[in-house]
């Protein structure tokens, strides 16, 4: 069984690596618990309902995982209170305190940024802790694995930070939903900015994380930059958590490439970017051009780790704490008051997913996955920091504006590290629901 502790700011930081955490409650859920007339997996019958937060508490993406846990705790506080943060700016006003008359508690697991560990962790939360929904993660490999498990188990999966096209493409599932954007959107938004700043006809070297997200990101960048004459001279796969990337960077020096695209994330991006700059790549001239580096998927946490190496480097992001819409300001204020620093995009997307799930349950009047899913499908909303957004029914992918950013040359603080250079309208990153392959299939409500 999972250990339950009283959660506050100190305990979240102290127990960030714990196997599971829950808000203090006298009621413990058992597998297959039922409410009257509710015959679906883990239907709650007491006065509480349990969410399962599955995040990387160890491994290369642990910084994102820690921020996700902070955001989830804040979201649970706001859901139970019926207000606070972006719940006050959210266009849906269904949540007024708890969900369907029940207080939300939660348990957590460590994905370790490994698919097998993530599935095992999610399975424990579903079977041992009665989790009605699983959410979280910072790896697309993990997301796809856990999404498949949740489909089999009959619970909803609200994906965390997952950027591979496959999550809502060929590996989409009816029980899975993604708020975060994907590599297709990154390519569409980022390529015009790269052309405007670096021109056409460049020789490109890709270093790519060797799993579904890296492959997807590499492919999307190639798709949108090759028409402007950006030719791939090499695409080299690197293991997640490599640490030392020198053996992968050395061959770039004599490759004839004048552009390096780092399809890395988390500590891997911090290490590979820092080492590429230390090797002098940004000081080189090749083919009569200044050598440039591109990081397609950025986060403030990564830039914080990379320091000066990230200055002036372009990328994309799902959200940034400097946005001035009412939702973003409310979230930054609430998160900052609780933790003392601004939230990351990982924190933002996971907070949104918790709110969106709770709201859908409230609007549906049940926690039954098929009914909750229908409440999310083609749901139009605003007030959660990304502008007008739609949860498309065809693939369970959110569509919203995309931010193109670059590392600030003269940051005013250790958090003021990214500059938003363009907000790409949602219409420019939309695509047909069947373009990326895959089928949702039927909902699974699970066995009671």
Model feature map: region roles:
Residues 48-67, 204-207:
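Short beta-strand segments enriched in small/hydrophobic residues
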């Amino acid at each position: 069984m999972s250990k339950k502790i009283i959660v506050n700011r100190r305990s979240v930081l102290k127990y960030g690596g714990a196997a599971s955490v829950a808000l203090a409650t006298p009621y413990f859920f058992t597998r297959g618990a039922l409410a009257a007339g509710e015959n679906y997996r883990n239907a709650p019958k007491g006065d509480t309902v349990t969410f399962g937060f599955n995040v990387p508490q160890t491994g290369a993406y642990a910084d994102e995982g820690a921020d996700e846990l902070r955001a989830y705790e804040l979201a649970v506080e706001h859901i139970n209170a019926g207000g606070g943060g972006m719940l006050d700016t959210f266009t849906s006003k269904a949540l007024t305190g708890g969900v369907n008359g029940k207080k939300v508690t939660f348990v957590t697991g460590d994905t370790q940024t490994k698919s097998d560990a993530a599935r095992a962790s999610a399975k424990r939360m579903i079977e041992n802790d009665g989790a009605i929904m699983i959410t979280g993660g910072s790896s697309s490999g993990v997301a796809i694995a856990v999404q498949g498990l949740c489909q089999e188990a009959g619970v909803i999966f609200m994906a965390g930070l997952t950027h591979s096209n496959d999550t809502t493409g060929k590996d989409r599932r009816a029980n899975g939903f993604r708020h975060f954007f994907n590599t297709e959107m990154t390519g569409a938004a980022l390529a015009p900015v790269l052309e405007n700043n670096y021109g056409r006809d460049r020789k490109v070297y890709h270093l790519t994380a060797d799993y579904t997200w890296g492959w997807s990101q590499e492919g999307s960048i190639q798709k949108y930059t090759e028409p402007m004459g950006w030719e791939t001279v090499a695409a080299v796969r690197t293991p997640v958590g490599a640490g030392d990337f020198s053996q992968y960077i050395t061959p770039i020096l004599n490759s004839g490439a004048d552009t390096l695209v780092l399809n890395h994330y988390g500590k891997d991006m911090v290490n590979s970017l820092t080492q590429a700059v230390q090797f002098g790549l940004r000081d080189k001239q090749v083919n009569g051009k200044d050598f440039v580096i591109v990081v397609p998927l950025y986060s403030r946490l990564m830039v914080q780790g990379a320091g000066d190496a990230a200055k002036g480097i372009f990328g994309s992001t799902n959200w940034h704490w400097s946005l001035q819409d009412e939702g973003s300001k409310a979230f930054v204020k609430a998160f900052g008051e609780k933790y003392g620093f601004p939230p990351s995009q990982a924190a933002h997307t996971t907070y949104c997913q918790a709110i969106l799930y709770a709201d859908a349950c409230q609007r549906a009047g049940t926690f039954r996955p098929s009914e909750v899913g229908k409440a999310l499908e083609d749901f139009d909303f605003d007030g959660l920091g990304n502008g007008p957004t739609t949860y498309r029914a065809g693939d369970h992918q959110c569509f919203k504006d995309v931010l193109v950013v670059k590392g600030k040359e003269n940051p005013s603080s250790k958090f003021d590290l990214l500059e938003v250079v363009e907000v790409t309208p949602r219409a420019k990153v939309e695509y047909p629901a069947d373009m990326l392959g895959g089928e949702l299939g039927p909902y699974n409500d699970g066995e009671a």
